[in-house]
Structure formats: structure tokens, C-alpha cells
């Protein structure tokens, strides 16, 4: 959306965290390439051009964590640290007009209280003491941390002890680097052999991994060298040799849901071989190949991949321990820190999950008002946030208002038809 905004004349400041500003070129360039290829395939005009991507960086304003930025005389924003991924932040918006009550809005964005690569800085006490309105995510608002099974390391150890090779689909940013970090720890602890080669495929994952190791981001110095021993980069030229090589191996490749990226090129050989195990470490949405494998939809049934029909013979494993979103108890713990919580707007989750989490917040009784964002139209008024009406009610009123106009047009058409018939 940023290049599209710039294309249509936006020339204001684009505020972001310092780490995001250093990762953004990778993300936007990749998005542009995907969009360009899609538009060529569908024979439609691209939404924006490469120069629009470049324009974004002209307006970029990297911000320090915890340092207030005066956007204009009445609005101030402050970024606070967030463990979701490197570069993530939570934002405090403070709105102040002479003679009016100050309004404070805290937006969590995608939130996680910790990150394997850094110590997440605490939000200062003064923020929690403000009269506050919070927009909070709820991706896992119906799940507790105690429900998460931390099975990855034990399962990897057991798979390799069975002399099987391991195929791990990963997200290019965050997940690929975290799993490489854990595999290195397992090597150092003697839980997996350093003799087993570890490969990383996927151009985007390579770019992010190089950036993570560069020292430019807020990654702790002792964690910069997270690549395991016997590690190898894989590209389109070396890929055939990796697959043809004998002996045990571990392959990490994009995409995490198995629907795109180099993963598709490996799958026909991997999935049909009982000497392989596939370990899904990312959230897989409905209808993706990853989800279908987790749900065992291809039991005794052929699956078509890259034009080949194969049967699933590889062992399928999955885990939710790498999720980059807080669970319900962690979200409640964050909200509980606010001493004067006026309004909580629950956002970013499945419809039922948002409702369940909103009910938990309401029952916890530490917020004066709790709403599910999207169920109602909410606007900013002089004295705070006001719920106008439900989306259904809005539609009903709109339809009712439009009905007389439709009736009027209908009557007019009938009169015209009558006049025409008389003239004949």
C-alpha cells in the first residue's frame, strides 16, 4: 500500500522503527516483483511501478524506540518495543487540543512479549498510568500459553535418530532465522550431529538472513552468528545437487504454508519418500497444502504437485511453538498493566476468537468498555472514542434511506413509459 499511496500523490512523512526502515527495501522489492509477475500473468496493468517503491524511501522517517515524535502541534506518537518480529513496535498516539480533554490511544499491532534475538524493552510506567484506549490484537485470543506444545527440538532429535532427512518449510523473515538459531544450539548441545548438512533455500530468506547477521538491527551481538555448522546456501543452480546428494540432510525453504517458493520444487521427491519427515512450523491457513497435510487429508489418496501425482509417505509433523503472536493470557497480562483503561477495542482475529477474547477482557473487569472492532462504527469525538452504530444497523438505515429514491425512480420510469406509449 505504501508505493500505491506515493503513486497517488502522498508526500508526507512515513514513520517507522529503525529496524523496519532497514528491512523495508527487502519486503517492498519482493512485493513489487510478485505483483508485477501476477499482473503479467493476468494481463492487467500493475498497481504501481518500481519508481513508486523508491519514492517510499524519500519520505521514510526512522524513529527511536521510546522517543516521542511531534507529528503536528496536536498529535504526538511514540514507538515502544515489541517481540513480534525484529522491527515490530507498539504505538502510543497522544492527541491534545487546548480546552479539550487529552485522548490517548495505544495500538499493540501484532504483539509478542519476547523475541529469541533480543531482549524486548519494557513499556515505561508512565504510559500505563495514562487514561488509555487500547486497540489489541487477538490472533490467539482463545489459546493459553500452557496449551502450546514445545515439541520441535525433541521431535527433530527423534527424526534424525531414525536416520530420516528433515524438510522444514519456513517464513522468510523471522522463522527461518529462529530455526537456524535453534539448530545451532542443538548442535552445540550434542543433540544433533554436526555431520548432517543444513541447507537454506529461498532468495528472500537469504536476504533477511544476511540482514539479521549484519549488525544493523537491534539483535544482541552474541546472537548475530546464529548459522549452524555445516550450513549451506542453496539457489536454483545448486538445488538439483542438494536433492541428488546421498545421506541425511536438513532443508529449510520457503514458503511456510507450502503453496509457493522453492518448497514446491522439492515436494514431489520429499513427500513421496518414507525416509523424509516434513516439519511444518508456521501457521497454515485453510485450503493451503500445509493445512491439508496437518489435517491428514491425503491419507491413501494421491496428491498433485508440480504436475506430478504422488502419495504421502513422508512423516508429517507440526508445532505452534514458533508463533509470533501472544496468547490470551499474555494479552490479558499486557492489558492488566494499564491503571486507567477506558476502552479496549479487540482487533485482528477470527470473528469468534475476537468475541471470546472480548468477553474475557470484559469479565476481568479492568476496562470500563470493551468492543470488538468491526462490529460497530467507532469514531473519535472531542471527549474520546464513540460507538456510533453496528455494521448491520448501518446497512439497514442506508437501505431504508435509499428506498424512497428507488421508488421515486421507479415511478418516474413508469410515467415515462406511459408517455411513450401515448405518443405511439
Where do the language-model regions lie?
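Hydrophobic/aromatic beta-strand patches that form the interior of the parallel beta-sheet core
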Residues: 15, 61-63, 78, 106, ...
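Core dinuclear metal-dependent hydrolase active-site scaffold
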Residues: 62-121, 241-246, 250, 261-265, ...
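Glycine-rich phosphate-binding "P-loop"
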Residues: 136-150, 168, 221-227, 312-332
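Short, compositionally biased "basic patch" segments
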Residues: 117-135, 284-311
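Amphipathic alpha-helical heptad-repeat segments
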Residues: 27-28, 33, 299-302, 306, ...
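His/Asp/Glu-rich metal-coordinating catalytic cores
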Residues: 1-197
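Short acidic-hydrophobic, aromatic-tinged amphipathic segments that line or gate anion-handling sites
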Residues: 58-66, 228-237, 372
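Hard-cation-handling environments
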Residues: 153-292, 301-304, 338, 347, ...
Amino acid at each position: 500500500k505504501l508505493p500505491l499511496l506515493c503513486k497517488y500523490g502522498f508526500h508526507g512523512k512515513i514513520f517507522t522503527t529503525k529496524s523496519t526502515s532497514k528491512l523495508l527495501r527487502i519486503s517492498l522489492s519482493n512485493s513489487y516483483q510478485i505483483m508485477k509477475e501476477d499482473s503479467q500473468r493476468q494481463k492487467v496493468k500493475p498497481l504501481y511501478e518500481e519508481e513508486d517503491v523508491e519514492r517510499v524511501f524519500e519520505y521514510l522517517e526512522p524513529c527511536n524506540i521510546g522517543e516521542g515524535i511531534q507529528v503536528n502541534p496536536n498529535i504526538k506518537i511514540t514507538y515502544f518495543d515489541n517481540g513480534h518480529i525484529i522491527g515490530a513496535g507498539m504505538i502510543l498516539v497522544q492527541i491534545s487540543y487546548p480546552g479539550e480533554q487529552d485522548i490517548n490511544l495505544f495500538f499493540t499491532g501484532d504483539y509478542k512479549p519476547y523475541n529469541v534475538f533480543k531482549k524486548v524493552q519494557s513499556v515505561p510506567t508512565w504510559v500505563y498510568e495514562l487514561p488509555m484506549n487500547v486497540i489489541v490484537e487477538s490472533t490467539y485470543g482463545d489459546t493459553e500459553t500452557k496449551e502450546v506444545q514445545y515439541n520441535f527440538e525433541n521431535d527433530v532429535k527423534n527424526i534424525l535418530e531414525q536416520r530420516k532427512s528433515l524438510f522444514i518449510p519456513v517464513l522468510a523473515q523471522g522463522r527461518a532465522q529462529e530455526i537456524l538459531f535453534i539448530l545451532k544450539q542443538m548442535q552445540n548441545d550434542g543433540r544433533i550431529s554436526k555431520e548432517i548438512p543444513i541447507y537454506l533455500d529461498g532468495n528472500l530468506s537469504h536476504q533477511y538472513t544476511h540482514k539479521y547477521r549484519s549488525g544493523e538491527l537491534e539483535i544482541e551481538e552474541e546472537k548475530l552468528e546464529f548459522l549452524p555448522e555445516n550450513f549451506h546456501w542453496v539457489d536454483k543452480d545448486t538445488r538439483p545437487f542438494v536433492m541428488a546428494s546421498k545421506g541425511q540432510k536438513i532443508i529449510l525453504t520457503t514458503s511456510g504454508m507450502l503453496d509457493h517458493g522453492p518448497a514446491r520444487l522439492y515436494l514431489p521427491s520429499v513427500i513421496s519418500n518414507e525416509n523424509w519427515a516434513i516439519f511444518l512450523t508456521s501457521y497454515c491457513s485453510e485450503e493451503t497444502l500445509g493445512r491439508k497435510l496437518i489435517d491428514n487429508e491425503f491419507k491413501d489418496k494421491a496428491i498433485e504437485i508440480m504436475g506430478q501425482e504422488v502419495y504421502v509417505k513422508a512423516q508429517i509433523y507440526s508445532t505452534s511453538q514458533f508463533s509470533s503472536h501472544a496468547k490470551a493470557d499474555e494479552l490479558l497480562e499486557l492489558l492488566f498493566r494499564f491503571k486507567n483503561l477506558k476502552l479496549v477495542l479487540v482487533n485482528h482475529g477470527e470473528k469468534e476468537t475476537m468475541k471470546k477474547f472480548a468477553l474475557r477482557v470484559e469479565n476481568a473487569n479492568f476496562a470500563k468498555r470493551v468492543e470488538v472492532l468491526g462490529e460497530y462504527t467507532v469514531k473519535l469525538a472531542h471527549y474520546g472514542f464513540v460507538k456510533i452504530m453496528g455494521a448491520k444497523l448501518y446497512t439497514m438505515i442506508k437501505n431504508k434511506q435509499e428506498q424512497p429514491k428507488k421508488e421515486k425512480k421507479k415511478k418516474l420510469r413508469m410515467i415515462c413509459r406511459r408517455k411513450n406509449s401515448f405518443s405511439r
